[in-house]
Amino acid sequence: MFNINHQLELSKRRTFAIISHPDAGKTTVTEKMLLLGKVIRTSGTIKARGNGKYAKSDWMNIEKKRGISITTSVMQFTYKNTLMNLLDTPGHEDFSEDTYRILTAVDCCLLIIDAAKGIEDRTKKLINVSRLHNTPVITFINKLDRDSREAIEILDEIEKELSLDCIPITWPISCGKNFKGICHIHDKIVNLYQKNIVKKINFNSFSSFLNEHSLKEYLGADLYTQLHEELKLAAYVYPKFSKKKFLKGDITPVLFGSALNNFGIDHILESLIKWAPSPIYRVTKTRKVEPEEKKFTGFVFKIQANMDLKHRDRIAFMRIVSGKYKKGIKLRHVRMKKDIIVSDAFSFLAGDRFSIEHAYPGDVIGIHNHGTIKIGDTFTEGEEIKFVGIPSFAPEVFRRIFLKNPLQQKKLKKGLSQLSEEGAIQVFRPMINNSLILGAIGILQFDVVIERLKIEYKIDAIYERVNISLARWIRSKNKKIISDFINKNKSYLALDISNQLIYLAPNKANLAVIKNIYNNIFFEKTREQ
């Protein structure tokens, strides 16, 4: 185990992801956190505008053009002597696989909910994934300055739809045009709301230990009475916060505010400092690895191609689990059974990166990837272990890709290989011909790949529909059975980027029949990286 200094570094780190249904305000919350962390001076306008300003966390050209988040941004900043490692996940559901992998690298989630819309479809899916790892969740009800539903109605919906017990920490004073602020339920501090100039941070607090008379005068008799009744009801209905239950993922503390107007963001950050865990252990195939351990371990959860278009580089994002990164450290690339010297790791602020001398558990560092690193790879100071829990998901939509210029075939294979490595798309090579089949979770992924091939690799390509509706990875310990299966079903089989065998079914009926015939073969929807 390490010394007191190492324990201090662990204690001041929080690694968390922001998750939400699209348009709930996730990217806005991210921007306002960066403002409070004093790493940017103004926030972007989130959607493409004529003045050329965009969200800092949306750094890819296509994100700026479309006004959506399609890739994970990693950002590190300090707030009140706490080092925050923030992972802003893709907002669009077509890029959910990237989000799932990111949740394996964090210790806490911040869930953003639109106060008018409440729980939406993607919200449920994200919470189910966080539950796989028992990741604790803090909830922020956003957009209180717009017309919204009653607070207690939203809390009831969270408990019913997400099976999470809510513990309101703050309580809204009305909403929409009448939104007056929030009250901290237990210490009775009131934060009065004033609409700030958009994109400008107001560091002056409106907190007031208001006495009964002045608060009643400010709110008016009716609203004052309503607030008192709601606070009494909340105190009666909802139990007090328990950090133990929170860390187990059984309850979620709930905060209210308006991210666009910088109201309530400081409460989120303070809650993360107070309740979110410092870096926790991770599981390998053989044992747990604790963050206090002396020797370095880490795993790659994301690869990004062409962060720097001038150099065509590929960056591997690594979550440090234990030990300490030091410039020039010798690391074991476990899957490749090779040792490497890492002298140029860096930290991130969305698309920007900065060289670092050292890093600790909970930190996300970037290292250069020359084509040998894959998502899920483990790095150690010599121990032969493998971190688990980073999945690939079977794609749900498929296309065949063609070149407008056949002479670019070599460039196309290279581009698709790199985009596949980072998880932007899945590439399959049929066993019976030389075509290339792309698989994705959603249609938008295909549009993004075509655009990235054009911008980053100077390749013009088009798609055609293909008679495939389902894909399943094939697994069996019996080599004879697999060999027989391949010989009889080659027209439905392909290899993925890792040379894993996959069955491409034209419809559900076909898959059901083949599974019934080969009931001693596993047809799997997910595959461990």
Curated annotation (Swiss-Prot):
UniProt GO MF annotations: GTP binding; GTPase activity; guanosine tetraphosphate binding; translation release factor activity, codon nonspecific; translation release factor activity, codon specific
Record keywords: Cytoplasm, GTP-binding, Nucleotide-binding, Protein biosynthesis
PROSITE patterns in UniProt: G_TR_1, G_TR_2
Pfam families membership: EF-G_D2, GTP_EFTU, RF3_C
Source organism superkingdom: Bacteria
UniProt xrefs under InterPro entries: EF-G-like_DII, EFG_III/V, G_TR_CS, P-loop_NTPase, PrfC, RF3_C, RF3_dom_3_sf, RF3_GTP-bd
One Gene Ontology cellular component annotation held by this UniProt entry: cytosol
Biological process according to GO: regulation of translational termination
Binding site for GTP: 20-27, 88-92, 142-145
Gene3D superfamilies registered for this protein in UniProt: P-loop containing nucleotide triphosphate hydrolases, Peptide chain release factor 3, domain III, Translation factors
HAMAP family xrefs: Rel_fac_3
Family: Belongs to the TRAFAC class translation factor GTPase superfamily. Classic translation factor GTPase family. PrfC subfamily.
Function as written in the Swiss-Prot or TrEMBL entry: Increases the formation of ribosomal termination complexes and stimulates activities of RF-1 and RF-2. It binds guanine nucleotides and has strong preference for UGA stop codons. It may interact directly with the ribosome. The stimulation of RF-1 and RF-2 is significantly reduced by GTP and GDP, but not by GMP.
Name recorded for this polypeptide: Peptide chain release factor 3
Organism the protein comes from: Buchnera aphidicola subsp. Schizaphis graminum (strain Sg)
Gene: prfC
